[in-house]
C-alpha cells in the first residue's frame, strides 16, 4: 500500500515489478548523466568570452552529437524491450484467470476449475470493518497462489477499462471484443490493491481491484470450498 506523502514506488510484490523498479533507477541514472553534461555545456558556453563568428561547420562535433544520443537511446531501449517481452510472454502458467471489466465492477473466471467465477464490487463505506481501506475493499477478492505463474486474460463487456495493480507491476487495458494477455508471479503473500486506470464512466473511481496472494495449499482449499 502507498503511504501518505510517498514519492517512490510501492513495495514490489512480483518479479516483474522488481525489474521495473530496477529499470526506473537505470533510466534515472542515464537521465542524470545527460542533464549533467548538458548543464555543464550550457554553463561553459555562457561563461566563455571567446567568440568565433567564422565557424561554418564542425564535422567532429556533429558526429559526436549524432552517435552519442543513439547510443543512449539504445541503452534505454534494450532493457525496456526485455521487460516488455517478459510481461507478454507466458510460457508455463500454473493457472489462468479470465478478467472481464464491466461498468463498474470486475468479473473473474478461473478457467482451470469448474464453476469458480465471481463478480467483484467495491464495498460501500457502511460495510467497512476497522482496518479496511475506503474505496479499495471489495466483496470478492481475486485469490491467487503465490510464487506460481499466473496468466491473466483480460477483456471488457461494455467500454474500455484498465486492470491495474501497481505493487504487481501490472496494467492491462480491457477492450471489448479483444482478449489481452499478461503474466505475473507474486513473490510474497498479502493483499494488493489497484483500481481501474481508464476513465470508463460516472463510477470509474469506484471499481477497485484487490488481489490476495496465499500459499498453494490454502489456495486449493479455497477452490474446494468455493461457492458461486
Curated annotation (Swiss-Prot):
The keyword Transport applies. Its cofactor is Cu cation. Gene3D superfamilies: 1.10.287.90, Cupredoxins - blue copper proteins. Pfam families: COX2, COX2_TM. Binds a dinuclear copper A center per subunit. The chain crosses the membrane at residues 27-47, 61-81. CDD domains: CcO_II_C (cd13912). It is found in: Mitochondrion inner membrane. It comes from the Eukaryota. Residues 48-60 are mitochondrial matrix. One of its GO terms (cellular component) is mitochondrial inner membrane. Residues 1-26, 82-228 are mitochondrial intermembrane. NCBIfam families: CoxB. Component of the cytochrome c oxidase, the last enzyme in the mitochondrial electron transport chain which drives oxidative phosphorylation. The respiratory chain contains 3 multisubunit complexes succinate dehydrogenase (complex II, CII), ubiquinol-cytochrome c oxidoreductase (cytochrome b-c1 complex, complex III, CIII) and cytochrome c oxidase (complex IV, CIV), that cooperate to transfer electrons derived from NADH and succinate to molecular oxygen, creating an electrochemical gradient over the inner membrane that drives transmembrane transport and the ATP synthase. Belongs to the cytochrome c oxidase subunit 2 family. Component of the cytochrome c oxidase (complex IV, CIV), a multisubunit enzyme composed of a catalytic core of 3 subunits and several supernumerary subunits. The complex exists as a monomer or a dimer and forms supercomplexes (SCs) in the inner mitochondrial membrane with ubiquinol-cytochrome c oxidoreductase (cytochrome b-c1 complex, complex III, CIII). This is Cytochrome c oxidase subunit 2. It comes from Lumbricus terrestris.
Amino acid at each position: 500500500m502507498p503511504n501518505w506523502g510517498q514519492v517512490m514506488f510501492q513495495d514490489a510484490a512480483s518479479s516483474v515489478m522488481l525489474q521495473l523498479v530496477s529499470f526506473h533507477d537505470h533510466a534515472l541514472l542515464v537521465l542524470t548523466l545527460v542533464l549533467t553534461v548538458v548543464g555543464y555545456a550550457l554553463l561553459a558556453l555562457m561563461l566563455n568570452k571567446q567568440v568565433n563568428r567564422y565557424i561554418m561547420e564542425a564535422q567532429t562535433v556533429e558526429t559526436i552529437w549524432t552517435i552519442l544520443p543513439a547510443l543512449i537511446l539504445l541503452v534505454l531501449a534494450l532493457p525496456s524491450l526485455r521487460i516488455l517481452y517478459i510481461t507478454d510472454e507466458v510460457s508455463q502458467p500454473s493457472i489462468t484467470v479470465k478478467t472481464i471489466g464491466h461498468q463498474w465492477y470486475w468479473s473473474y473466471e478461473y478457467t482451470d476449475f469448474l464453476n469458480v467465477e465471481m463478480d467483484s464490487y467495491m464495498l460501500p463505506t457502511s460495510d467497512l470493518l476497522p482496518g479496511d481501506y475506503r474505496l479499495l475493499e471489495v466483496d470478492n477478492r481475486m485469490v491467487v497462489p503465490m510464487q506460481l505463474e499466473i496468466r491473466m486474460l483480460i477483456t471488457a463487456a461494455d467500454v474500455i477499462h484498465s486492470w491495474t495493480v501497481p505493487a504487481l507491476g501490472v496494467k492491462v487495458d480491457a477492450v471489448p471484443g479483444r482478449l489481452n494477455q499478461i503474466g505475473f508471479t507474486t513473490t510474497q503473500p498479502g493483499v494488493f490493491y489497484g483500481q481501474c486506470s481508464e476513465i470508463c464512466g460516472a463510477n470509474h473511481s469506484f471499481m477497485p481491484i484487490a488481489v490476495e496472494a496465499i500459499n498453494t495449499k490454502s489456495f486449493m482449499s479455497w477452490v474446494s470450498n468455493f461457492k458461486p
